[in-house]
Each structure stands twice: as structure tokens, then as C-alpha cells.
Amino acid sequence: MLRAQRLRLARLRACVSRGLHHKPVMALRREDVNAWERRAPLAPKHIKGITKLGYKVLIQPSNRRAIHDKEYVRAGGILQEDITEACLILGVKRPPEEKLMSKKTYAFFSHTIKAQEANMSLLDEVLKQEIRLIDYEKMVDHRGSRIVAFGHWAGVAGMINILHGMGLRLLALGHHTPFMHLGMAHNYRNSSQAVQAVRDAGYEISLGLMPKSIGPLTFVFTGTGNVSKGAQEVFNELPCEYVEPHELKEVSKTGDLRKVYGTVLSRHHHLVRKTDGVYDPVEYEKYPERYISRFNADIAPYTTCLINGIYWEQNTPRLLTRQDAQSLLVPVKSSVVPVEGCPELPHKLVAICDISADTGGSIDFMTECTTIERPFCMYDADQHIIHDSVEGSGILMCSIDNLPAQLPIEATEYFGDMLYPYVEEMLLSDASQPLESQNFSPVVRDAVITSNGLLTDKYKYIQKLRESRERIQFLSMSTKKKVLVLGSGYVSGPVLEYLSRGNNIEITLGSDMTNQMQQLSKKYDINTVNVTVGKQEDKLQSLVESQDLVISLLPYVLHPVVAKACIDSKVNMVTASYITPAMKELEKSVDDAGITVIGELGLDPGLDHMLAMETIDKAKDLGATIESYVSYCGGLPAPEHSDNPLRYKFSWSPVGVLMNIMQPASYLLNGKVVNVTGGVSFLNSVTPMDYFPGLNLEGYPNRDSTKYAEIYGISSAHTLLRGTLRYKGYSKALNGFVKLGLINRETYPALRPEANPLTWKQLLCDLVGISRSSSCEKLKEVVFTKLGGDSTQLEAAEWLGLLGDEQVPQAESIVDAFSKHLVSKLSYGPEEKDMIVMRDSFGIRHPSGHLENKTIDLVVYGDFNGFSAMAKTVGLPTAMAAKMLLDGEIETKGLMGPFSKEIYGPILERIKAEGIVFNTQSTIKL
């Protein structure tokens, strides 16, 4: 391979020499953007090699450069200020724009490949000057691994810095440690001196001089690349023992204080598939969004110092979020009586050294890099603030983005060794000629960002990124948009959280639930106003007219009231609920007002519509037709929390859920319309589900599915069904309540406040037609008969206390009272979580005649002490649509659901970043 490269370079030299009177000239420019940048891309030994090949090398004078100018001159370089003679100019960091020279080849770290805003003016000047820009960051091998990088020395310097920082932080917490004798990496002449200081600290540790009350120190290294290896190289100079990640918990409590413990974390140690907790490396590379990280629960609680060397990619799990940090900063309970002068650590995690310096990356709350001048900051997760002092509450953070500059001589030699084999072909580059005419190796060719005044084909995406970012910036700079959120129930949390991420939206929360509003206002920067929609029409109107958008999270019966106020004030509106007939009646008024009202933006309806339309539209683009569409969706308790007769729990009023089974439903099956009457007979339509067998699900049709043939544009379908999922046993239990007359919406005077209180036993006696004075055994016997001798249904009634002496809640109707009772019995506890399960099934007939059976699955779990699965999957798409309306991404006017690509496309893409990820599978039948 080397022989082939030499032959290619020899031919290139001959070709260039025929066209030029002199050999190409290379220049090493001085670094003049950052005061700490003392590195160079090549060391004197590399200059010597280049001059031996007969090339002229110019060295710009620099007193800042760590390697003296004399060393470069001794190696054959020519020291001079003017480098206009050079055709190749090498540097480490970006040059000032005014010093760029046209039609030259430059090589440096441009930091433009992600359309970084700070360097876009540089990129513009590079294009204007028709410069050929080679970016070291994109010099990669056939596996995509970087060939030239400073990563090793970033790891070395970062580790030295964080040990110094831990000394300061532990002192602030009341502990002198051997780390106090360590300095910042740049305080040492070279790494050998730093290593000796680390060894000295290690010797003191081995003598048992670490404070006993802080316990064993544990260091976790993420990644196995050069950064991690460089950090471990320093760590190994301490008296250390490496353990497996699963051993970390034990050693963090009982380890030897005369040593420190380390663990190297790879993907398989903390990444697991959301559905089954297994890690598949091949699948992860393709579908990282299917995985979550267990680092926050399995590793971080037993980590003293995290050394992070991995970059975060979109759709991949983060190591730590703000919520994780909050839980990690909870004080550790100890059985040991504290001694005032020998305190225990307030929490295990003391420090994070984020060598990746990837803001908003795998460490979500690392939003700004620190600097060599100010290397440390403290992150207070509870307040979500960063402060410079090493004192107070929080995690010590070090995230310097130019760490190798602290050890400039060794970093220069290391980097130059990797770059040197490619310098000659870069030197033979003629920036005035088309890129295609250059005989570059793939390593160099694929690192060319610009040439001949244009972005190269591989990097044209940068312009699109720029345009997208500039558009977002323009919108954020404009006047704050005003949003009124009506309703403070379970969905409001994710909506408020999502809309609060930027600083360009002023949110007002309106509700008649004062306590809920107060709790939400503590978490989010919002205004609150007490309003009862449906009873305070004038107040609602005055609130709406000052807004840019209204989000209604109220019960669906109140949406028309809100919509009328929006129509009168010409204000856009979104909601998660169904577009009911009452809303449909307002369609012309919405059109006349010239506003946009979007409904059905939640989960079901909502995400189910969006997935259906995306699949249908893609099929139509291929000339295929939809022969069948079946969608089932359900909000359920997590399996471990489903142990009750209904196999169900409620996070909001159960009235809607209960009344759903009383409604008729219709669907299309093999070309025939099937009508289902609600009430007692609905049990006949319940079907056991054969997918997700571990969940033991059943399903039943929901409302009128046949209308979606027109809405979805799939009149070709012979089967069309939308249904509800529940755990097996739910429908049977509810069927028993229907038989007993408990799901009845008619007014029941005996339950009104002015009536005498009733017990459930008395009410049930009334419902089954026996005297209230009847014995419990008599009531049980009559109820059993009423239930058709179904012992399971009887047990459900008994479990809920319906045959006992507990008082019936006051209400307008029996079902309202029953709902209140169910809330008291079957609400989620503080340590319980829910889940949502959805499956969409399509039969797609392709033009070839083949039938594709396609399924789309969604399973989402609620978060402990966070948002429920239902709240996330309903609230987030609603909030996203609201944001799209505010940002002008949705321009269509009128009353609509999320059936157009304009709406569903961005939402389905953005929802993935929130951890709501769909799994798609297809099989083809010939």
C-alpha cells in the first residue's frame, strides 16, 4: 500500500514539475486566534523530512508557538512573515478571515461541517477567495475512523485537569486530599512532569491518606478510543484497580481506600433495547433510537468522577439528562453518625470531565464549554444553573474544548506523525485547477470541504443546515409569541416543558385548578390565570384576543366554547381531542375567520393518524393501493402495576373511558360493514390479540372506523378498523358493571348533595331491585344472578367494595359517582408507571401484484417521577404542532386534523428525538 502511494506521488510530482518552474512551497502559519494555542500541525522533524524531498517550507514567526522558531529553522524551514509564495498553508485552528489568501490550499480544523454559526463567515470568505479547504477532522480511513487527531493528548490533559479540580472541590466540601498537590496540565513543562506529580499523589493515597468519610473513589471512562486511552494513561499512575461496571456498586461502598477504582464503559454495558432490555450492536448501529441508556441508574449512582470521551449523535441515547442529575444530587442517607470535621460527601458524583466538549450532547446539561483560563464550573441541577465557584451545591464540570493546547509540544509531535504521510500530496494540490483533476488519495479528497469557490459534493449539505439554522434564528429573534394553554391536567406538563425550551414564547396557563397551576408554575416560566371555561365567557374572550395561539387541553365538550372565542379573535388553536360534530359545525366560521384550528393531535387520535397517512402516502407514491388497515391502541398500566380486576388504572377522570363501551361502533371487514351496539353486547366484539403475547392483550372496535376510508383516501380498502387495546379481563369486568347499571349517565337524584348519603351496598340494592335492608349474603346472591352467574365479575365488584358500606361519592349520575370511586381505588401510585401500546397493520398491494403486510409498533413507558407515557404521547405532538404554527411551518387555514404531510412529516421526525420511536416490519407475499 505504501509502495502504491509512493508511485502515485512520484507520478504527481512529475506532472506538477512539468507545469511549474519551481517546486510547490508550503507554509506553516502562526496561530493567532486563541491566546492558548501554542501547537503547530507539524514538528521540526516533519519539516526536515519535507525539505529533504526538495520542497521549500516557510515558517511564520511566532513567540507563542511552544516549539521555538530556531528548531524549525534548524530543520530546514525558512523563517519569514510573508507566506504568499506558498500554495499549501497549514495551521491548527482557523486563520483570521482578513488574512486568507485566494486560490491557495489551506488545511486546518475549520469547525464548519455542522454549519457552526461562529465559523460561517469564515466559510463564506473561503468560498469567495476560491480556497481549497482541507479539514483535518474529515481525514478518515475506510471505516470512518479519524486518521489525524489530538484525541490522545486531550485525554491526558483532561485527566490531569479533573484530578486538580477534584482536589479543589473536595477541599470545598471539607476534605484535604493528595489531589491538592496537582496543577492544571499546562503548569507542567511536559507530560512526564505531570505524571510524576500524579505518581506522588498516588503514593500518598497508597499510604492511606485519603479521608475515610468520603469513601472509595471511582472513575468511569466512557468510550475506548484515543481520548479514553489518553485519560487512562494518567489514571494508571495512581494506585488503581479496574473493575467491571457491574462491580462498581460494591467497590464504591466497600473498596480499599488505599487505591482508586476505574471502569471502562462500552456500549453493551449501558445500552439496552427499549422493548426487551437486550443490546444488539448491529441493530444499534442502524436504529439507535430503539435503545435507551441505563447509565443513569446502573453506573452513575456509584461514580465519583465521570470522564466522558464520546460524542452524541442525533437519535442516540444520552448518558445523563438534567432529570438524571437531579436524582444523582439527592443526599445519600447514611447509617453512620456524622462527625462535624469529617463530613461525608453530599452525593457520590463529584465531578464530570467532558473531554468531548460536545455541548448539549451525551451530557445534556453541559451547555457551554469551560476554558483554560476558567476551567471549572458547577452545575446545580435543582436550579438548572451553572456557577463558577467550586463551592455550593452541584457537580464539578470541566469541558475545555482545546485541551491538547495545554501540552503543546507533545501534541504537535503526535499530530504531525499522523499528518506527515499525507502532506506531500496536499502540497502538490493546485487550488486553481478543478478538484477532479487532482490525484488525491481518498483520505485527502474526502476531507476537501471547498474547492474552486464551491462546497464540494460531499459537503453541500452545509448550506441547507445554514439556511435551516438562520431561519430558526430569525424566528427566535422576533417578538415573543404568546400562547394560552387551557387546562392543567396530566397532558399539560409535556406541553409546557416543550414550549419552554426556547426563550421566544410567553406562556399563560389558564385553569380553575389552582393547586395544579401553582405546581406547574414552579417548574416552568409561565404566567397563570384562574378561569373556568364554559362559565366565564367574557374572561375567556379577553384572554384569547391577546394571544397568538390557544392550546385547549380541556375535556372535549369544552373545545367548541374555546374555538368560538378563537374565531371571534382570529387566533389559531390546537387540541389533542377528536374533531367532534360540535366542532365540525364551526368549520365555515373557522374558514371565514382565516385561522387554523387543528384537532386530533394526541396519540389516539393523533400519532395513529400520522403514521397511517405517512404509510398511505408513501404507498400511493409507489403506485400501490391499501387493501386493509387495522389500528389498535391503548393506554395501560405497566404490567407490574396491572394486578387488579380491571387490569387497568386511571390517571384522569374515567368517565370517558367507561362511556366509550356504551357507544356503538362500526368497521369494515372483508368488504362488509360490521355494526357493534354498545352496552352489554359490546363484549361480543372483543378479540384476543396475538401480538405482544407477553402482555396478554385484547381489543375492541372504537367508534365509526368506516369514515376513515374517505378521510385517509383509501376507498380501496376491504378492511378498515380502529380499536382500543386492554389487558385481557378488562372488557369482562366492565361488562359486569354494565349489567349492574353502574355505567349510566342519566341524572340520579339520590346522589345529589341535598340527598341523604348512600352506601355502595344500598345503591346496589336499589339497582338490583331488593330492599336496602337486605343482608350482604342476599345482595351477593342477587348480584351473582344479575351477572349471569359470572364469578369473575362478582369478584371484581367485591374487590372494588361495591357490596360494602363505603359511602358513594356525590354526583349527578351513577357513572359519575362510579368514576370518582374508581379514581380512589385505581389511580397510579407515586412509584407506578403506565405504558402505551399501539399497532398499525397495513395490507399494501403493489403494482407488481405482491402483497406487503406492514406493521408499525409503538411501545412507550412512563418515567418514574417524570411524565407518564400517555402524557408524553398526547402532549408532545400537540406541543410540536403548536410550535409549527407559531413558526409558520403550517400555513394552511381551516379546521383540520394531522392528515397532511405538512403536519405529520415534521412531527413524526421530531418525536423520535423525544424517545418516542416506532418499530416497522414488513413481509411480502408473492
Curated annotation (Swiss-Prot):
Signal peptide: none annotated. It comes from the Eukaryota. One of its GO terms (molecular function) is saccharopine dehydrogenase (NADP+, L-lysine-forming) activity. The keyword Disulfide bond does not apply. It is an enzyme of class 1 (oxidoreductase). It catalyses: L-saccharopine + NADP(+) + H2O = L-lysine + 2-oxoglutarate + NADPH + H(+); L-saccharopine + NAD(+) + H2O = (S)-2-amino-6-oxohexanoate + L-glutamate + NADH + H(+). It is found in: Mitochondrion. Its main location: mitochondrion. The modification N6-acetyllysine is found at residues 48, 52, 56, 93, 128, 138, 286, 458, 523, 535, 584, 707, 739, 761, 778, 780. The modification N6-succinyllysine is found at residues 93, 138, 274, 286, 333, 458, 523, 535, 584, 732, 761. L-saccharopine binds at residues 577-578, 604, 703, 724-726. NAD(+) binds at residues 488, 512, 516, 554, 576-577, 603-605. Bifunctional enzyme that catalyzes the first two steps in lysine degradation. The N-terminal and the C-terminal domains contain respectively the lysine ketoglutarate reductase and saccharopine dehydrogenase activity. Homotetramer. This is Alpha-aminoadipic semialdehyde synthase, mitochondrial. It comes from Rattus norvegicus (Rat). The gene is Aass.
